[in-house]
From Swiss-Prot:
Upper lineage: Bacteria, Pseudomonadati, Pseudomonadota, Betaproteobacteria, Neisseriales
Catalyzed chemical reaction(s): succinate + ATP + CoA = succinyl-CoA + ADP + phosphate; GTP + succinate + CoA = succinyl-CoA + GDP + phosphate
Gene this protein is translated from: sucC
Protein's pathway: Carbohydrate metabolism; tricarboxylic acid cycle; succinate from succinyl-CoA (ligase route): step 1/1
InterPro entries to which the protein is assigned, alphabetical: ATP-grasp, ATP-grasp_succ-CoA_synth-type, ATP_grasp_subdomain_1, Succ-CoA_synthase_bsu_CS, SUCC_ACL_C, Succ_CoA_ligase-like_bsu, Succinyl-CoA_synth-like
Organism: Neisseria gonorrhoeae (strain ATCC 700825 / FA 1090)
Protein name according to UniProt: Succinate--CoA ligase [ADP-forming] subunit beta
Statement: the UniProt record of this protein carries the keyword Nucleotide-binding: yes
Keywords carried by this UniProt record: ATP-binding, Ligase, Magnesium, Metal-binding, Nucleotide-binding, Tricarboxylic acid cycle
Keyword Transmembrane helix: no
GO molecular function per UniProt: ATP binding; magnesium ion binding; succinate-CoA ligase (ADP-forming) activity; succinate-CoA ligase (GDP-forming) activity
Cofactor note: Binds 1 Mg(2+) ion per subunit.
Binding positions (substrate): 265, 322-324
A GO CC term attached to the entry: cytosol
Amino acid sequence: MNLHEYQAKELLASYGLPVQGGILAHNGEEAAAAYDKLGGKFAVVKAQVHAGGRGKAGGVKVVKSREKAKEVAESLIGTNLVTYQTDANGQPVNSVLVCEDMYPVQTELYLGAVVDRSTRRVTFMASTEGGVEIEKVAAETPEKIFKVTVDPLVGLQPCQAREVAFQLGLKDKQINEFAKLMTGAYKAFVENDFALFEVNPLAVRENGALACVDGKIGIDSNALYRLPKIAELRDKSQENERELKASEFDLNYVALEGKIGCMVNGAGLAMATMDIIKLKGGQPANFLDVGGGATKDRVVEAFKLILEDKSVKGVLINIFGGIVRCDMIAEAIVAAVKEINVNVPVVVRLEGNNAELGAKILNESGLKLTSADGLNDAAEKIVAAVNA
């Protein structure tokens, strides 16, 4: 689950991080009032969406009057912002953050943290190349990224934070200020189950003080059950409607841009299914893992999700029967197809527990369901059907 910038800043401020001042506005009048309250020579109006690349997409504007703040806010709120991180429809802008005047600054730094799967620990990344996408820095000048891995038994040590400060070229009081900031960030990361933390840029102001000009936080969705206050911050308007509906039925769904809908049990098998569809010249329309408890109701909902995407021209069902029997899955598929009147080609591959019985149920159903002998055969059949 992602947080908006204003939510991220509020959370980080509660852990003692120095954040750029800002006021949330839901309309032009509120934006104008926010500009007056901040009282600087200028302000920055930022569209609040769950996507990066806002600046290049016109979602971040510098304004030098209350009238301009109102005008920019009204031009953004109620629209969809399309960035390189969104699909063609973009993300809805429901509010803007009017931020205080902080520039010019001495320099811009970068500080971020993720859970490193290779070390299975929280790893901080810092760079002198702030204000630039960290992926670009990693690709072009990786030597400018400094990494610190935190031992979960002892937590982030002051010496580690100071070492990063030295690497960033900070001096005197800035070193302790940065150490406090980084320690607060680690505490926030652990206590709130962050999956991602990023401050870019971390500005060094003309007076030498540090300030978080932007804030990006991603929460591990698996931990939301123990984070009730964080869960309240969820903005469902920023999520894909089908993905949101899928979560209500415990279906793991990710919308893609192809023509072949996929229904699979198991994330690994689902990825392999998408790979072989691509290999055979097709394009998957989604990732959909129905999980181990694939009941009739879940299969029906899975079909509905897939077919709500009007670009879907065919469906490939790939089920490996383990605990869940293939005959039970076949019965659920037949019932689902009858209930929702599926009118696109459907290819079914069943393997494992009671696979032969499952195939028999499909073949005797009288429905236009095509059985496949193996994944390779299934992919070839669905690609051929869609391209016919």
